[in-house]
């Protein structure tokens, strides 16, 4: 096929501009990204060769080679991995996957460190070569294709690129960077080695360079015809913990998670017994951009006897721990394991149980830290992944108690929206006569904090948890108690805050009896809007509030389901009125404006709990009429 010149996808042009102009001060990341791509190409070859050993083409020793030519001012990264066909070269080097494009650009902050971190995360690392090169030449051939189907891809990083078919004997990919003026420091063995050891020491593939020795006569380093490996070239997780430094763990995390930030915590151990495997797990310090996408692929990298099998093996972790990154290397699974086999395998179930327990132990260590730095780390973790972890209450029955201990909530104990109250903290502060853990759900912290349902709790000094995450109502349908104490909504059913003395009981009964004509007339007036109307003593400042019956769906959950486009049963609340409030005291069952007052008390209560009025115009008209009659 003859040479073709093609235009870059518009987003790639934008990306190239960013690479060249915005990330210059962090330019050495280009080598990290290109080495990482070469390592992935080797992993893919190993995986495909499990089915077809001929793909090795008599060259089974996988490696990455770095070389440079001072005269030509070029730097070359060469691998003997899977390689690319012509179509793959056009697809991989000319476009960015559409799904990630918009998110990538929306995440760019202008902070060079943070923006550099996004490059690997979004799979656009190849283009980082243009930070230091004004032209890139890629020669490649896919394993299994004939030598006549080699490909040359070339671009100056402007608007287009050319693709040509060439003869290429060796499989794999050779990337040649034609360096920009001022980048001569990269034409140095010492400089390249230092970048490799900084970013890519953990890569399990040997990274080779020609040895150099000092030539006394020439007074300079001279290249020898002998290779040396410039990285450790062993799978980091196979080493003893004592042989791995903190810095090496951090670098490995950045490689495996495509993240430029350090992890919050990690755990590394070998498990022997029913199943034998090594696990190296990390807790990231921030959530990936697509964590909530329906097609988000969480999971760990799976290896069998150090052979890479798959990325994102989600069967090794429950969904609520999908943010955990890392590696599992099994000694028992077959090398030809597929995603289907993973679903059925007894060994995988044992690994999943073990990995889940280990991940929860890691989170427990973070949560129980006594020092300020440790506490700060758990706060960081909770703000990034707290809502995901809450899913575990419903998804993981076996570990529900452990997950519940890790949960954090805002509460009336503090005057901030910080979610830093553990259920154990709440229980420790409970009043001697208190038997339940009380909570309120709302759309926002402000709405929860100012809910009329909290008035009597404030008066009696009883703490209430303020729940404002979308997942909370769903979670509460599984979390019925903690430490033997039932969880109770302040907006559901009858309220019991402890025994009343005889005088109080008698006074309340008399008030209820006196209000009966008003209550009955209100029920009749409001009709199908309410399930019931009753006198309450839970309010101190507000005239009315809405509560759900014990077995009914709350108004908050109904609104959430509707917002998600799901069918929700109609909400028929109970209207509770405060007999001590002046507005309620002034109600006359036979008054001409009784109907307007009834609807106003209902609408006010609905608004106070975050609901939406069915007919705002009537509400305004009714309110104006009542204000005018009072003013007159």
UniProtKB/Swiss-Prot annotation:
Gene3D superfamilies: 3.30.230.80, 3.40.50.11260, Heat shock protein 90, C-terminal domain, Histidine kinase-like ATPase, C-terminal domain. Signal peptide: none annotated. It comes from the Bacteria. Residues 560-632 are annotated as: C. GO terms for molecular function: ATP binding; ATP hydrolysis activity; ATP-dependent protein folding chaperone; unfolded protein binding. HAMAP family: HSP90 (MF_00505). This is Chaperone protein HtpG. It comes from Burkholderia thailandensis (strain ATCC 700388 / DSM 13276 / CCUG 48851 / CIP 106301 / E264). The lineage of its organism: Bacteria, Pseudomonadati, Pseudomonadota, Betaproteobacteria, Burkholderiales. The gene is htpG.
